[in-house]
Amino acid sequence: MRYLSVCDSVTGCGKNFPSDMNNCPHCGEPEWSCNAGDINPRDYCYDIEVYPNVFTVKFIHIATDTRWKFEISNRRNDLPQLTDFVMQLKACNARGVGYNNVGFDYPVLHRIVMQQMNDPRAIYDLAMKLIKGSKDEKFALQVWDRDRLFEQLDLIMVWHYNKENPVTGTEPTSLKALEIAMRMDDVEDLPFDVGTVLTDEQIDELHRYNEHDVIATIFFYVRSLTQIKLREELSNTFGKNFLNHSNTKMGGDILIHECEKAGIEFFDRVNNKRVKRQTIRPSINLGECIFPYVRFERPEFEAVRALLASKTITETKGVFKGLNADVDGLKYYFGTGGIHASVESRIFESNETHQIIDVDVASFYPNLAIKNRLHAEHLGVEFCNAYEGVYHTRKSYPKGSPENAAYKEALNANYGNSNNAYSVFLDPKFTMSITLNGQLLLCMLVEQMIIIPGLEMIQANTDGITYYCPREYIEHTRALCKWWEQLTCLELEEAQYSRMFIRDVNSYIAEYEGGGLKRIGAYAHERMDENPGTREVPYGKDPSGLVIPKAAEAALVHGTDIRTFIENHADDYDFMCRAKAPRSNRLVMRWPEYDNAEIDLANIVRYYVSNSGGSLVKIAPPTGELGTWKRAAKVSDATYAAVLAELDTGRLAPYGTSNVQDVDANGIPWDERIHTKNRSKHGIREMGVCVGWRVTDCSNVKNFDRSTVNYDYYVQEAEKLVKPLLTTPSL
């Protein structure tokens, strides 16, 4: 089995592509006619599986597809062979490739080899600490670069798919999600619940699953070769190991490196320890952040400026909450992520009288800082010169080159980390100076544009505006752009669209003059397998039902009938969708017509909407103790505890004078002071997926049956992206 193919330079394009794809995504050359691509012979992909009575690990040498498997269990002890193998990897300067191997697989493997662990239960306990332990416990178990037996390349870190946010519920992107994104034939999850004591037959099955995961990781590895090469080159250039850095972290480190060369100090020595330099502010006067040349003629924009200038804040969160300006019927929303405004459910078309024009600020936030000498206070004004040097270094590399991309990340790291409590760039006043002025300066351009007779604003976003301009005033708008550039010392880049199809600010299609489409939000459908440089559907994004935006595009751009397009669409994978449930939840397939009979599914599955399936349901545990009253909002812990104690001690057996329906599972009566007004109780929560439609699990692609696809669902969803735009008069 080979994993990387290369097109013939004569009959094809000569480029590399993953061998699991049927055709070259660049030129369409069939895979069977291509040659094997070159893979670094140092790279060995591996993955471990751990249960209370068994440990398995699978290695595959990617370049040759040579495979090894090892087991430590009550029936078999491969520890001596595993130790020898790992030491051979060390001796030949091998590199271990994995998915979350730095955070999990390697720390377990390292301790097994170094401590000669042959007790599967002890190995399992170690693994559980890495999965469920506290931050301190996990940190203590990490193995740093200098101590590793062989180098590690972790793809989850390269792509920054390990990010999580407990507040928003964002979880790391799992390997299973990537299997769906890469369109693997068989998407598999752990075959047995964590903690199960496995039989011999189950252990044999575990080995097969272990190999499946390694192959899936290799598939993702060959799709990551450009990112890996960039990190290897930058590591050599800067003398620092960037191999497992995300783009953001890599950019921050490059910026620090370049500025330190210019004499900028990012760290102090305190008690012989290196301590980050930061600017921590108890409060920020926003009036001091706004540039003195920000002035408005329109009272709506001036009211926003005046309100912001009058504020002194103690935290940046919520500064712009509810802040907007309605100007000539278009609402401009201000936020920490930038300004946003857009017409909705409209189609615009350039014609003999009007032209759609889009202007964006080149490297907006970096140049805003450079031209206005903005910097974190602790870094000093000298930082501005060094930062500008990084900008010019980026400009020296061609667009699309790895170096250009790396220095772009370095430039973005300044603002991106300025509100990060763990960063050497921390200064929230700098953060607010950038985001406040960025939005207000764009509004200054907007208010001059809307004076022009017949000009209509279409959109405003973080770094630019789009407008529908009478052709006789195009040169006048360019003069206004030149005036704005001279005022701000920034540069605007113009693009012209022939048509725009707009659902809202987050979802639209823009057709460039001369061809080419810009697809945003609900209309995006280009996958990274089709174009590695796309930002439409990256590997970490849910690729569900791509036939829907494709049909909408065909209808809007080409006038194709939606149902005709969908029923004749040849790519079966475009009908497939992804369902995902957190590990604490259950995902079940239920059949209401059979007394709600149900079967448990994996926590992430692939499915399609069918005429013959069941109902897909997520089942979540209660957010509190089952059957107890839900706590009202804004009730302090002290108040809640005091009232609860009062209710508990005042109860009479069995329920005092309260009606049985007014007490919860613990016998606590409902009290308006601390409980929700609607007397809701904590219970099992159910959320339907594709409610009202039947679905069929096709995690194994063999279960996809085109004859059972319910085209009505896909047609209906595509119509939601098309019909609202057609009911509004077009321009």
Residue ranges and their predicted role:
Residues 3, 164-165, 169-170, 181-189, ...:
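Conserved "right-hand" nucleotidyltransferase catalytic core of DNA-directed polymerases
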Residues 4-5, 28-36:
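Short Cys/His-rich micro-motifs in 6-15 aa windows
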Residues 6, 12, 23, 178:
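The −1 position to Zn-ligating cysteines in a subset of zinc-ribbon hairpins
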Residues 8-17, 28:
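Cys/His-coordinated zinc-binding microdomains
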Residues 20-30:
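Cysteine-rich micro-motifs
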Residues 67-176:
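Conserved DEDDh/DEDDy metal-dependent 3′-5′ exonuclease domain
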Residues 156, 169-171, 190-196, 324-447, ...:
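Helical catalytic core of nucleic-acid polymerases
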Residues 324, 474-731:
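C-terminal, non-catalytic extensions of nucleic-acid polymerases
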